[in-house]
UniProtKB/Swiss-Prot annotation:
Belongs to the universal ribosomal protein uL6 family. SUPFAM superfamilies: Ribosomal protein L6 (SSF56053). Keywords: Ribonucleoprotein, Ribosomal protein, RNA-binding, rRNA-binding. InterPro entries: Ribosomal_uL6-like, Ribosomal_uL6-like_a/b-dom_sf, Ribosomal_uL6_a/b-dom, Ribosomal_uL6_bac-type, Ribosomal_uL6_CS. HAMAP family: Ribosomal_uL6_B. This is Large ribosomal subunit protein uL6. GO terms for molecular function: rRNA binding; structural constituent of ribosome. Pfam families: Ribosomal_L6 (PF00347). This protein binds to the 23S rRNA, and is important in its secondary structure. It is located near the subunit interface in the base of the L7/L12 stalk, and near the tRNA binding site of the peptidyltransferase center. Part of the 50S ribosomal subunit.
Length: 178
């Protein structure tokens, strides 16, 4: 049995979980999320504890077992505490500023780059070179942060670009001069 999948999920106080057939809905103080469980996997709720079970030991069932348990646990974490990714901008003249709920980046291009916040995502600009992406869906927060990072990936020679906070960029040595 999956080591992750067999662990029960404890539902904390203030979180409401509904299992309706193959749809699991989680509602908490920060919002509401739902997930459709893949067909061979079964989710049951008893006495404030969620258990994820699989009917057989086929390879597909085994892989979905741990995945489903982790996705539901991430939903519960999201509606209680939420998720946040911090990004840093490194480079001369590279900066970000908030324009309402959107962001405007100056990244060395001939034009400013605008990023609008999707539903459920909030941006916070701490300094012109630091920003954070937060929301209740771990997947959505990670995807939006990755899309922002993709606007100007860190350069391996000078280290300029957008990076996650604490990310170490592997630097390359430039060509040898005469």
């Amino acid at each position: 049995m999956s080591r992750i999948g067999r662990l029960p999920i404890t539902v904390p106080a203030g979180v409401e979980v509904k299992v309706d057939g193959s749809v699991v809905s989680v509602k908490g103080s920060k919002g509401e999320l739902s997930h459709t469980v893949a067909s061979p996997i079964e989710v049951s709720l008893e006495d404030g504890t969620l258990t994820v079970a699989r009917p057989n030991d086929e390879r597909a069932s085994r892989s979905l077992h741990g995945l489903t348990r982790t996705l539901i646990a991430n939903m519960i974490q999201g509606v209680t505490a939420g998720y946040e990714k911090k990004l840093e901008i490194v480079g001369t003249g590279y900066r970000v500023q908030a324009k309402g709920s959107d962001l405007e980046f100056a990244l060395g291009y001939s034009h400013p780059v605008n990023v609008s916040a999707p539903n459920g995502i909030t941006f916070a600009v701490e300094t012109p070179t630091k920003l954070s992406v937060s929301g209740i869906s771990k997947q959505q927060v990670g995807e939006v942060a990755a899309n922002i990072r993709k606007l100007r990936k860190p350069d391996p020679y000078k280290g300029k670009g957008i990076r996650y906070a604490g990310e170490v960029i592997r630097r390359k040595v430039g060509k040898a001069g005469k």
